[in-house]
Amino acid sequence: MLSRHLTVLRSACRVSHDLRVPSTQAVRKSAWSVCYSRRPLHISRSDAASTAALDMGVAPAVEKDHEILKELLDTRHSSGHVLSQGVPTGLFQIDHLRTPSDFLLLAQRTLIRCQLLVQRIARAIGNPSELARVVRNLDRLSDMLCGVIDMAELVRHAHPDQGWANAANDAYEYLCNYMNVLNTHTELYDALRCVMETKDIYHSLSQEAQAVAHIFMRDFEKSGIHLPPHERNRFVELSDQIMILGRAFLQDMSTGTSDTIVEFPTDLLDGMDTSIFAQNLFRLRPSKSIPVVPGSWELHYISKYAPNPQARRLAYMISYTGRTQPVAVLEQLLHARYELAKLTGKQSFAEMTLVDKMAGTPEHVLRFLRLLADAQRPVAQRMIAEFGQLKHALEGSSQVEIWDREYYADAYLQRHHPSQLAPLSPYLSLGSIFTGLSRLFYLLYGIHFRAAETLPGEVWHPDVLKLEVVDETESSVIGLIYCDLYTRDGKPPSAAHYTVRCSRRIDLDDTHLDMELGASADLPPVADTEHLLGVKGATGFGRPGRFQQPVVVLMTDFAPPNIGHGGACLLRWHDVETLFHEMGHAIHSMIGRTEFHNVSGTRCATDFVELPSILMEHFLTDPSVVALTAHHHRTGSPLPYVQLQKHLATQRSLDALDTHQQILLASLDQRYHSERAGAPTFSSSQELESLQADMGLFPPVSNATWQGQFGHLFGYGATYYSYLFDRAIAARVWEQVFAKKPLSREAGERFKMEVLRHGGGKSPWEMLSRLLHEDKIADGNAGAMEAIGRWGLGQNQSNETISAHL
């Protein structure tokens, strides 16, 4: 998933840095001498993979980089880290970010520098040459702030040193407070509005610049800047209230049940293996009951394995009914969002949110979800009917309740896939997967990964691996990926992609005029700019001028290398899916190198941004990609594809149920953010019960409070449909562009040139229309949404492909 942050003038702010890239020759020499001077490099295990890659068209010099990368990741002595003996530097090679105390100083200097630029923009009205630069200067302002805010966002979550984490948090909050001021800065808004209303200036802007102008305008108006003063003040109050309620909602989710103990009768557990409870529970309560916490793993275990239906029912009711506190907070949040939308003249929060998304309106989203549900429901209902047959055989009743799902899903799997599956992990070493990804990107887009040295002080943990992304046509580094791969105490457990620096053209910056045109007696003097994130940039990228190089961080929580596996980190299949997914985001950032910070890479519509990452999941299971990627960590032998097919057939057995549940949740999200939330009698539990009766596969449960654990209602309010939407698009792109020849450079170039390179600087509907040669969807109207709904999610075709190979 993408990291989601607070923003400045934009709904998806990312971080930027100054990272000076050492020469290719120096990096390769240093990497070799530092890591391999004590022993020779053995590559015989990967000969089969290298031979296959060379046969498919990977250049020998590129494959040499892959051999080094694999050795780094699959040998314990290096942990994937290449450390230079060079001169110490600061975090991310920012020389003046060497200690935690430097963070707030950097933020303070950045704020002063931004104030100059704000004054310059505010004074642009009446000066045609300055008006023509307003959009670029707003983008530069956003880039300045994001350069510190998003770096701080990463460091406060990733840095193991609490001093650094606290300092990053202080800098983050300091600049976010200023960011909130800018979002309601009327003079900035007036300058932008003047640009858009002055036709000769507006039409002189490039397509990208016009897109950025509209983005800024929408974000200003979403902040209520066009409202009368008293309504604007109310808008700010509601926005603050929404943030407070959202944090409280998430806090209640994670800690709200920790002090709630419920006694669970032990006689209901007869017939199931309770040895897993022995040390923790039965030792403390040897007779009539055991203490359980709502939502705990113990209750989930009971739901899945207890033969007694009363045990399963009780486990469900303890976890998903009666938790009124988070539901009360959620309903306050939903009502505050409704009131906020009404202030801006919209009928609902969903209407306000979707205006700049591909879907456009709540009605379009609901139509899309209904089409998906109609296609998915028959398959899911057949599965529930089989659950009923299994239940009738065991219990004498064929009525499947919601608390029966996990138990009979397990029974269903045992019936259809009774044999033990051979493990995949021996073929899924971290080194093999990374080199396979790099080979895939080289064949598709002409880019590959090369391990690079890090200077002392550059990274936040010794295990962080730095990768250069190298383009064959430019023979140069086009971006950097820092990989923080292994689990550790205090590190977030989920995978994420952080954009640390966006692409932006910098040779057109006339920063010397900021002081001349923005200086004010009210501002403190700016002694220098050496503490700011000045970026020298690079030429190339298929465009004129100098650009910031994109930099991203890929964060996962994989198990560290195991000496029992020869020092290799062996992944589970789910880990590989995660890595492919997140690398889809990373490559979007690398290729989406635009002139403007606000539309580069993954800075595009929420319901479009997952397309490249979901498309990567299609590549992952293709035989030709598996041949590039999965090889035994000891012998180098390729993963037998039939072995993977059996695994996938089992894994996807319940896809119909899971997909139907996602459709239901996306529909619930739309209901909660509709005008219903403004009704005095609004009840989120009643809405959930009504939706279950309308669309659900199981009888509804009265007074359910499950929605109090649906955390995405805060972070993805009114946009939870996006993942399903992009699944449908990705399935179509795979089928139309890649399925016949997955490793085709022609297909890769087509996707790169029509989609990836534009970031968010072009209409997603226009990009898709050109990519798929489907003119009827270019306008993104109701018909286009219906077309995508009718495309479906593609899983039936995938399952048929798997079955055909078995």
UniProtKB/Swiss-Prot annotation:
<protein>
    <recommendedName>
        <fullName>Mitochondrial intermediate peptidase</fullName>
        <ecNumber>3.4.24.59</ecNumber>
    </recommendedName>
</protein>
<feature type="binding site">
    <location>
        <position position="581"/>
    </location>
    <ligand>
        <name>Zn(2+)</name>
    </ligand>
</feature>
<dbReference type="GO" id="GO:0004222">
    <property type="term" value="F:metalloendopeptidase activity"/>
</dbReference>
<feature type="binding site">
    <location>
        <position position="585"/>
    </location>
    <ligand>
        <name>Zn(2+)</name>
    </ligand>
</feature>
<dbReference type="GO" id="GO:0006518">
    <property type="term" value="P:peptide metabolic process"/>
</dbReference>
<keyword id="KW-0479">Metal-binding</keyword>
<dbReference type="GO" id="GO:0006627">
    <property type="term" value="P:protein processing involved in protein targeting to mitochondrion"/>
</dbReference>
<comment type="similarity">
    <text>Belongs to the peptidase M3 family.</text>
</comment>
<keyword id="KW-0496">Mitochondrion</keyword>
<feature type="transit peptide" description="Mitochondrion">
    <location>
        <begin position="1"/>
        <end position="29"/>
    </location>
</feature>
<keyword id="KW-0645">Protease</keyword>
<dbReference type="GO" id="GO:0046872">
    <property type="term" value="F:metal ion binding"/>
</dbReference>
<keyword id="KW-0809">Transit peptide</keyword>
<keyword id="KW-0482">Metalloprotease</keyword>
<dbReference type="InterPro" id="IPR024077">
    <property type="entry name" value="Neurolysin/TOP_dom2"/>
</dbReference>
<comment type="function">
    <text>Cleaves proteins, imported into the mitochondrion, to their mature size. While most mitochondrial precursor proteins are processed to the mature form in one step by mitochondrial processing peptidase (MPP), the sequential cleavage by MIP of an octapeptide after initial processing by MPP is a required step for a subgroup of nuclear-encoded precursor proteins destined for the matrix or the inner membrane.</text>
</comment>
<keyword id="KW-0378">Hydrolase</keyword>
<dbReference type="InterPro" id="IPR045090">
    <property type="entry name" value="Pept_M3A_M3B"/>
</dbReference>
<feature type="active site">
    <location>
        <position position="582"/>
    </location>
</feature>
<dbReference type="InterPro" id="IPR001567">
    <property type="entry name" value="Pept_M3A_M3B_dom"/>
</dbReference>
<feature type="binding site">
    <location>
        <position position="588"/>
    </location>
    <ligand>
        <name>Zn(2+)</name>
    </ligand>
</feature>
<dbReference type="GO" id="GO:0005759">
    <property type="term" value="C:mitochondrial matrix"/>
</dbReference>
<dbReference type="Pfam" id="PF01432">
    <property type="entry name" value="Peptidase_M3"/>
</dbReference>
<keyword id="KW-0862">Zinc</keyword>
<dbReference type="InterPro" id="IPR024079">
    <property type="entry name" value="MetalloPept_cat_dom_sf"/>
</dbReference>
<dbReference type="InterPro" id="IPR033851">
    <property type="entry name" value="M3A_MIP"/>
</dbReference>
